Amino acid sequence: NLQVIKSALNNPGIIIVCGSPLSGKTHIIYSLLLEAVNKSKNIMTLESIAKYTLKDVHQCELNENVGFNMDKASRFIEFQSPDIVYLEGIKSKESFDYFANLVFDNKTIIMEFLANNMEDLRYKLSFSDFETLKSLISCMIFIHSQDSIEVFTKETVQKYLA
């Protein structure tokens, strides 16, 4: 499983980390980011609040109250030219399309996806708006509980979410 994750970090695609609220998604993601920093990757995060300060990572905090939302923050990606982008979540179709296009520009995207269980995930991803997302997932990490984490390869994700 670790090799699947490391391979996904080194190749363009979307790494999606799923789980229920407070399941440890952010902890797993920050671990992935630290692994990538150690490989000298240029990393940028777009998140509501930076939970930890990560050395050598461009961390960008969103603030809807002053109009600094995901759409505006995404413009900074072009200036930073990161290899890996972590985003906490996507709230608009336009943002999603933008981040999907980053994969075609050889970027790795790490994103959180809230799902209480596998059935919930399948239901949420069953809508046609997610077809492109599903095709770009290179690795999926699903946190069932603190003691149960499942890692899916691109092929397994495609079969499971079809």
Regions found by a protein language model. Name each.
Residues 1-162:
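Short, flexible helix-loop junctions that flank or precede catalytic/ligand sites
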